[in-house]
Structure formats: structure tokens, C-alpha cells
């Protein structure tokens, strides 16, 4: 993409993006560690350093997916955290989460972030106070109370 622009990618548009199918039993993803370790290794899905991830349950997947595809179908997008009417990875993720129908509090926290623009870590901690950190080929699950997660750093 040209300088200052980005685009939404998926396995149809970028063959180097691969995903591991979730194994679900009793309503829970059984291979979450394997999925996250795979994503953390891929330069196409993750920059450098720790990977943070969380799960959002009870969502409208179809609406979230349609929102992601609608943004993707726009083609090249102005890219940057402070670009008006533009996007970046965190803004894209926040838009898709909002479209999934989260609770009122989560929608408000996503719409009005503490910082000027959504950030990856903020999206993770808004989504769930139980989250994952992947570093050095290890996947750690962090469980905090809602209160502690709201007022403390996501760092472990």
C-alpha cells in the first residue's frame, strides 16, 4: 500500500495469513494457546514484542464479520492513529468489537478511550479482564478482577 494508507487483510487477500481452526468443546475454545502461539509467530499478524489477546463472548458474529468486510471493501484507507476518518489496527478492532454488540459499558469504553485513539492493550482489557500474553513461545493466561483490570496496567 502507498505511504499513509492501509488496508484490511484476510486469508482471501493475503495467502501468507493462515489461521488454526478453533477446537470447541462445551462452549470453550480448547486450543487457544496453539492459536495464539501461531499468530504470535507470524510477522503478517503481529509486530514485535508481546502479543496480548482476549475473548469477547455473547457476540453477534455475523454483524461483526459484516462490519469487518465492509471496512475491507473500502480498499485503501487513510492510516494512522491520529488521522481523522482514517484507521489503524486498533481502530479497526474497536469498530468490529462495537459492531459485535458488547455490553453498554464496553461500548462506551470503546467509544471514549482514555487515550486519544484506541490502542491494542486498551482493546484487550476492555474486552475481558481475563486475557492472554504471548512472549518467548509461552502463552500465559492472566485473570484479574474487573476492578483491578479497570484501574491497573495490563502488563504482567
Q: Which sequence ranges carry the predicted segments?
A:
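Non-catalytic ligand/cofactor/substrate-binding and regulatory segments of enzyme domains
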Residues: 1-78, 141, 146-156
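Activation targets extended, charge/polar-rich intrinsically disordered C-terminal tails
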Residues: 69-156
Amino acid at each position: 500500500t502507498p505511504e499513509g494508507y492501509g488496508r484490511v487483510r484476510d486469508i482471501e487477500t493475503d495467502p501468507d495469513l493462515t489461521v488454526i481452526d478453533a477446537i470447541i468443546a462445551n462452549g470453550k475454545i480448547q486450543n487457544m494457546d496453539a492459536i495464539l502461539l501461531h499468530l504470535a509467530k507470524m510477522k503478517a499478524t503481529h509486530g514485535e514484542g508481546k502479543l496480548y489477546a482476549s475473548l469477547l463472548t455473547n457476540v453477534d458474529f455475523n454483524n461483526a464479520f459484516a462490519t469487518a468486510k465492509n471496512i475491507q471493501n473500502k480498499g485503501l484507507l487513510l492510516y494512522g492513529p491520529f488521522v481523522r476518518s482514517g484507521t489503524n489496527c486498533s481502530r479497526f478492532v474497536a469498530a468490529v468489537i462495537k459492531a459485535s454488540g458488547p455490553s453498554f459499558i464496553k461500548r462506551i469504553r470503546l467509544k471514549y478511550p482514555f487515550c486519544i485513539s484506541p490502542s491494542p492493550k486498551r482493546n484487550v482489557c476492555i474486552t475481558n479482564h481475563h486475557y492472554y500474553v504471548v512472549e518467548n513461545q509461552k502463552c500465559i493466561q492472566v485473570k484479574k478482577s474487573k476492578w483491578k483490570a479497570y484501574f491497573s496496567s495490563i502488563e504482567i
